[in-house]
Amino acid sequence: MMQFFGTIVTKEEPVNLELDEGDIFHLTKAIIHPKSQGKGKVYLTAVISLMEEDEMEEDDVDDEEESPREDIVEIPIGILEAGKIDQIDLNLHYNFGQIVRFELQAENGAGYVVALSGSVITMEQGGCDDEDCDDEHCINHEDDEEIDSDEEFGDSDQDEEDSDDEEIPQLIAPATKKGKITEISEVPESKKEKTPEPKKVPEPKKEQVKQPTQPQQKKAAAQQPEKANNKPAAASPAKPQNNQSKNAPKQPQQQQQSPAKNNNNKRPQNQNENNKKKQKN
């Protein structure tokens, strides 16, 4: 069973946490109270001392008789500062076997008021009282779940012995009549699977070249010489020009014959003139 728990801590008045056997305190938050007038930083400290076994067994001891405790630990669990850090989230669990005191420590801690809040989980006979409790820190809560699971599934020794004693009837397969096995030599044609024949693709038609008739052949033969005559003649090797070839060797002859021509061109003298020259001589 879970119960809300809240208290106020000041520097002058620390808080002692008192839990019954089987209880757990879950501290969740620390907030600066609106009535607080403190300034600066203040440390929230948990002073923890372990309870001895003798003290746990002797519950009827008078409160006046106090034995000194040696195992005392002071642990700061949070820092608060007015105007900057007004609250802090905590997740701390304390059980009944711990004696806890919450204090405020600071140089200027006067006037600070801090509120602590959380929940107390109460136990009865080492088990959780709340059936719907989902807290993992409940004492023996996991053991209760294991017991419930065993009862649900029926994992007990008696069930195993009873299951061994039970006889399981044997199942007998019904007898089948024996018949002759006939072998089929050939499969009838009607039952054979007809494989579809592939469709034939028509081949493209080839263009037929028409052969020329006889009159056309004659015309073609007559046209062949004409075509041959019309073809340009092949370029023959260039011959030397006649004028140049003739003039080239004849030039020296003309020069040699030129004096002869000059003599021939002279007019023959008359015989009378020759005779006159002889007489003078």
From Swiss-Prot:
Low complexity: bias regions: 210-273
Segments of skewed composition (Acidic residues): 142-168
Repressor in keyword set: no
This protein's UniProt keywords: Stress response
Pfam family, any one: NPL
InterPro entries xref list: NPL
Basic and acidic residues bias: start-end ranges: 180-209
Keyword Cytoplasm part of the UniProt annotation: no
GO molecular function, one term: rDNA binding
Any one GO BP annotation for this protein: cellular response to heat
Entry protein name: 32 kDa heat shock protein
Name of encoding gene: hspC
